[in-house]
């Protein structure tokens, strides 16, 4: 990925500077251990790491070159992984408590590391790179990328067929709301409109649907959009290649015909109806209904998270703060062991794929 530092030697051979060392430790264990009796096993190192951070910070925490303690656990089964994970978690708690640091443990996305679970240790800091949510009611805490939107099924009234209305010079949500209220006597706000954000994902067009009062958080989108290597917003050249997409007046109702994959915020529930683009210049449509007039290909957490949003556990309002990541722990599962052929013989003499964890300060 883009975080890797790549280089070549004088003979043209390709190398990279290690950002982390899951693969190397997996291969090392593969060459040294072969039985369930050798596990559980944890190995650590303290070594310089290199990452081409998009926004390197001054100081010692988030630079492109930094010293990191990384450790790796190896277990026969998931129950063993859970034990190893919790031991490392408690060791980190003991370490940070002994140092007197203020920190929060938050749910996080595993990202390119893979795996089923990860948590970050975040030290609150107004200039920190990470943003997280915290519920003072139940203690729920999560990186904004991992924040879950909890919504109820739509209970509103059914509406009639789509109506296409003249809305000249309304390419923005604010201008659209103004015209609807003044020209058509409506009583709407931005939350009643549907925003269609067009992007190119690995050079294929996609649309992300969010309520009109929200923005798409590209960092959240990238974290939750699995398997996509390159993501960028639509540019004028992309509209030129897709002439049926009218800039400022795009709606989801023709997405399938246009070859667009539809991703939607969980708030775009089945049966909800919206005011959105009519796919015609200077025209918008109302009563565009999810499930009837368009089908969502995949729901995704991509809308911006705000202070005051409901906690997914207790539904009380959350607060938002910034922080510096000082530790990150992962349950990697069998991703690396499967890829690199790390197995051990179990009690019956049968080979089983080892399950792994990764832990870094």
At which residue positions do the language-model features occur?
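Active-site loop/lid in soluble adenylation, ligation, and acyl-transfer enzymes
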Residues: 1-53, 199-200, 267-271, 335
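Extended, low-hydrophobicity, polar/charged segments
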Residues: 22-29, 55-71, 76-361
């Amino acid at each position: 990925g883009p975080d890797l530092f790549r280089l070549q030697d004088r003979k043209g051979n390709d190398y990279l500077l290690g950002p982390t060392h899951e693969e190397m430790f997996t291969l090392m264990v593969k060459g040294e251990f072969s039985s369930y009796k050798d596990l559980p096993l944890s190995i650590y190192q303290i070594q310089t790491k290199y990452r081409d951070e998009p926004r390197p910070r001054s100081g010692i925490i988030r630079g492109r070159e930094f010293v990191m303690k990384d450790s790796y656990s190896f277990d026969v089964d998931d129950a063993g992984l859970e034990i190893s994970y919790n031991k490392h978690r408690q060791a980190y708690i003991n370490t940070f408590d002994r140092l007197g640091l203020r920190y929060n443990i938050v749910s996080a996305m595993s990202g390119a590391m893979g795996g089923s679970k990860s948590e970050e240790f975040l030290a609150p800091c107004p200039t920190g790179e990470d943003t997280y949510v915290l519920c003072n009611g139940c203690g729920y805490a999560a990186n904004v990328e991992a924040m879950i939107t909890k919504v109820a099924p739509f209970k509103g009234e059914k509406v009639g067929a789509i109506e296409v209305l003249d809305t000249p010079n309304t390419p923005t949500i604010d201008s659209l709301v103004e015209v609807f209220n003044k020209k058509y006597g409506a009583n709407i706000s931005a939350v009643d409109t549907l925003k269609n954000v067009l992007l190119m994902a690995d050079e294929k067009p996609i649309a992300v649907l969010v309520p009109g009062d929200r923005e798409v958080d590209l960092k959240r989108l990238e974290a939750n959009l699995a398997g996509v290597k390159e993501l960028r917003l639509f540019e004028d050249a992309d509209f030129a290649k897709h002439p049926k997409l009218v800039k400022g007046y795009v709606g989801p109702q023709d997405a399938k015909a246009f070859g667009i994959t539809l991703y939607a915020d969980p708030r775009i529930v089945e049966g909800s109806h919206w005011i959105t683009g009519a796919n015609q210049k200077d025209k918008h449509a109302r009563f565009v209904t999810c499930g009837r007039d368009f089908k969502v290909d995949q729901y995704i957490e991509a809308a911006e998270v705000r202070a005051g949003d409901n906690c997914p556990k207790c539904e009380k309002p959350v607060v938002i703060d910034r922080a510096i990541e000082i530790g990150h722990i992962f349950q990697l599962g069998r991703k690396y062991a499967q890829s690199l052929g790390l197995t051990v013989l179990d009690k019956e003499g049968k080979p089983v794929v080892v399950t792994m964890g990764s832990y870094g300060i």
